[in-house]
Amino acid sequence: MAGTPNFDRRSFLRLAAAAGLTGMAGVTSATPGRSPGPKKDEILVGVTSTADSPRKAVADAVPGNAEIVHENETLSYAAVKFPSKAPKQARENFISAITKRDEVKYAEKNATHEALYTANDPKYGSQYAPQQVNADSAWDTTLGSSSVKIAVVDQGVKYDHPDLSSQFGSNKGRDFVDNDGDPYPDLLSDEYHGTHVAGIAAGTTDNNEGIGGISNSTLLSGRALSESGSGSTSDIADAIEWAADQGADVINLSLGGGGYSSTMKNAVSYATQQGSLVVAAAGNDGRQSVSYPAAYSECVAVSALDPDETLASYSNYGSEIDLAAPGTNVLSCWTTSTEYNEISGTSMATPVVSGVAGLALAVHNLSPADLRNHLKNTAVDIGLSSTKQGSGRVDAANAVTTDPGDGGGGGGGGSKETTYDGTLSSSSDSNCVSHSWNYSSPSQVVIDLSGPSSADFDLYATEGSGTCPTTRSYDYRSWSYDSTEQIVIDNPDTSADLGILVDSYSGSGSYTVTITEKE
């Protein structure tokens, strides 16, 4: 965010490397009959904000046997579909040709995603996740607030479940798989993941029914995965954009894996700019590699713990991890007659963090960046390395009872802001800034870029080397479809000046870089 957006405390799934909506702001209609679920024959083309529209920007480059089947004007991309029998080289040739255009920022395959995995509630005694994060102590202060919205981008949610029905308002959500206004699961026997996730985050607590969720927040369901547990990058990105536009304070992404996607990056960047905290699962491969989208700097990356607070054997880990939470054998809502079930995964740890975020927002009015910092500052060190626990195990009681101005356990809570103004005269023009640190050991630095809406400026940073980044050599990068960018660095290396590059991908004009160091 270039500057904190105005707001009023509004209120995993595995990615395979294979890689519509109507009547919503910024999204034009998809081609009628576009198949739901995986879209392996599609290429997503991202364009600059200066293009008339994504469709117009790429139309004359589309081969005769292909067609534009979808566009999202807010995220500035179009989906181009090739015949299923078209040779792989045809798609590769298209990507090579289209990315040479000045108005095109990227072209990538439309990836396929697959699902991974003292209150009076009768089953509360069979739970351990709320107790492990001290939710019961937090509930002495607040059970949560209906003014806080948590969006679950996942499979559909069984919103008439007895532990979920009161958490949904008149707007239940939207189905991005079938392209309609009802996010209810198509096949209850197979489509349980979203319901389980929703129950962990915000199943109704203290209602003499079933389990206790972490926070009594309002739920929104963005159905972007079908009953088969798979979905496309475009459907998930559109659902993230929609959730942000609906005023979601927290967007839960119990999905991820695979590689970097510019379309998904733009979606989580947009959501953050709109005032949403995006919480994502680290991945279930049991290796040192945090999956996307959790690895994006905008997302809170969550690893999974066993009941004894050791890292779960399946949980991914790495330097991008922000927080850890219980994820093994977590009891929550189910879609069949049993109504409740235990499953494991970073998918289950993620909504624990989302629920704690909901509790914190019921008490504290925080921006996404400040909420993220607050959750990390109030986390409990459980003795794991930072690559496994991040700042620690999320703690609901600390998040609710600690004044954000106190900085929790992570410093004095103060901050210092420095601004740098500049002008870029044309495309490919760039300026470098060398920033001297105000604090010797800040807990976090946030770099915001605000530039002209008619241009497309990108932001790069290096730490610990004292060198200026380039568009090819950098430690951090934020590049979306406009000139509003943000980089967040936790516990930055202050042994040398911070290097910052502002680069014009297209257009010209004045900009401001704001650097906020937090104690």
UniProtKB/Swiss-Prot annotation:
Keywords from the named record: Hydrolase, Protease, Secreted, Serine protease, Signal, Zymogen
Post-translational modification, as annotated: Predicted to be exported by the Tat system. The position of the signal peptide cleavage has not been experimentally proven.
Active site: D154, H193, S347
Leader sequence residues: 1-27
Gene Ontology MF terms in the entry: serine-type endopeptidase activity
Superkingdom of the organism of origin: Archaea
Predominant location: secreted
Transmembrane segments: none
Compartments (UniProt record): Secreted
InterPro entries in alphabetical order: Peptidase_C_arc/bac, Peptidase_S8/S53_dom, Peptidase_S8/S53_dom_sf, Peptidase_S8_His-AS, Peptidase_S8_Ser-AS, Peptidase_S8_subtilisin-like, Peptidase_S8_subtilisin-rel, TAT_signal
Keyword Secreted attached: yes
Ranges of biased composition (kind: Gly residues): 405-415
Name of the protein described by the UniProt record: Halolysin
Originating species: Haloferax mediterranei (strain ATCC 33500 / DSM 1411 / JCM 8866 / NBRC 14739 / NCIMB 2177 / R-4) (Halobacterium mediterranei)
Gene coding for it: hly
